[in-house]
Amino acid sequence: GVASITFRGNQLISGVAINFLASGLTVLIGQRWFELGGRTPQLVEGGRFAPIQLPFAEALAPVPIIGPIWSELISGHTILVYVALALVPVTWWVLYRTRFGLRLRAVGENPAAVDTAGVSVSGMRYAAVAICGVLCGLAGAYLATGLAAGFVKEMSAGRGYIALAALIIAKWRPWQALGTTLLFGLLEAL
């Protein structure tokens, strides 16, 4: 955020540089703290987020079509998956139904107009970076505790770039981004 907001650096170059820095720094910190070659110790079963079985998942399992969809596709994920899905309508509501969302979208589209209205462009951009950091932290927590049992070098395997591609394809809209990411997830699962 500082590189592109305060120092007005190119966002693409800053983003790639931060990714390279984070990739090396996480391994270095992991090596110093745990001395396991840049990995973390495996989490014990109680340290991971357990899958949640939704109501009627077992009862509906034998029902054709609906059963497999409910019991295998929708049920059995960790709490972080359901939180992420619940955040899609919340994100849409904040972006399209609140003053903060209007200002946030305006900062991206026309920062001069926002500045003329007396709103701090830098402040709004830093708020966006902070919110993005929280959401990316949720994604990282899922990778480290839900998908795997600890940190391993390059464990994201480019998923951040895939998420960025999904966002661009969805034209920065939350509901379309959900559909695009579900499509990408389906294609990855095949």
PLM regions with names:
Residues 6-8, 123, 171:
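Helix-loop interface residues and adjacent transmembrane-helix termini in multi-pass membrane transporters
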Residues 136, 146-190:
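Transmembrane alpha-helical segments in multi-pass inner-membrane proteins
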Residues 23-39, 136, 140-144, 148, ...:
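Juxtamembrane/transmembrane-helix interface segments of polytopic membrane transporters
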Residues 1-23, 184, 188:
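Alpha-helical transmembrane segments within multi-pass membrane transporters and channels
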Residues 72-151, 174-180:
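Helix-loop-helix "hairpin" substructures at the membrane interface of multi-pass membrane proteins
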Residues 5, 9, 32-39, 96, ...:
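Transmembrane helix-loop junctions in multipass membrane proteins, especially transporters and channels
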Residues 23-96:
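Transmembrane helix-bundle core of multi-pass membrane transporters
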